[in-house]
Regions:
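Membrane-helix exit/interface motif
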Residues: 50, 57, 90-100, 124-131
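Transit-peptide-like, low-complexity N-terminal presequences
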Residues: 2-31, 166-176
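Hydrophobic transmembrane helix segments
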Residues: 41-72
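Eukaryotic polytopic
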Residues: 28-47, 80-83, 103-176
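Core segments of alpha-helical transmembrane spans in multipass integral membrane proteins
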Residues: 75-98, 113-119
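Membrane-targeting and insertion segments and their boundary/processing signals
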Residues: 19, 62, 66, 93, ...
Length: 176
């Protein structure tokens, strides 16, 4: 009789282990879902709208001394339209890819790519002057999107890649 109970316990233990091995991955924490499913795609979409529909304002906010004013050169307009298209595509891809899966590996792969893009985005404003990175009292609306918001996104991505906020896998409670 004891052997039967032992085998039943062992089989039950094996069944539980099999279920745990095939369980879906832990969901992505709420903060990351809020930032990467909503906040970033909406802000990127906003950038697309301004780059396409408000080109003179976009250029003026980027660097007023070199902005051409209301008469935007055709080449500049084409480049801004292309930028708007890239922002639109990025916004839709991020929102749709991350909504399609809870697989943290997929999320992390995208976060690595976007983190590299964050560094490129920050580097792209260097011609404005090094103080653009820290002189917050001089920032305008587009600077807030280009600098502190990108800092925030990069830090949030780093936290996600480091596993901050995720439940630890394989942690077992000590039985007494």
């Amino acid at each position: 009789m004891h052997l039967n109970r032992f085998e039943t316990i062992r089989e039950t233990n094996q069944t539980v282990q099999n279920i745990m091995a095939t369980a879906p991955p832990a969901p992505v924490p709420s903060l990351y879902r809020l930032v990467f499913l909503w906040l970033e795609p909406v802000s990127t979409l906003t950038g697309a709208v301004y780059a396409y529909f408000f080109q003179a304002m976009y250029l003026d906010l980027t660097h007023a001394p070199s902005a051409p004013g209301a008469d935007i050169p055709i080449a500049t307009s084409v480049v801004l339209s292309q930028l708007a298209n890239l922002y639109l595509g990025l916004s839709l891809m991020e929102a749709s890819i991350l909504r399609a899966t809870t697989d943290v590996k997929v999320w992390n792969a995208l976060m690595v790519c976007l983190l590299l893009a964050d560094f490129g985005h920050l580097y792209s404003v260097l011609p404005v002057g090094r103080d653009i990175y820290w002189a917050y009292w001089r920032w305008n609306a587009i600077d807030y999107g280009n600098i502190p918001f990108v800092y925030f996104l990069a830090i949030t991505r780093l936290c996600m890649l480091l596993g901050v906020g995720f439940k630890k896998e394989g942690v077992r409670l000590k039985s007494t």
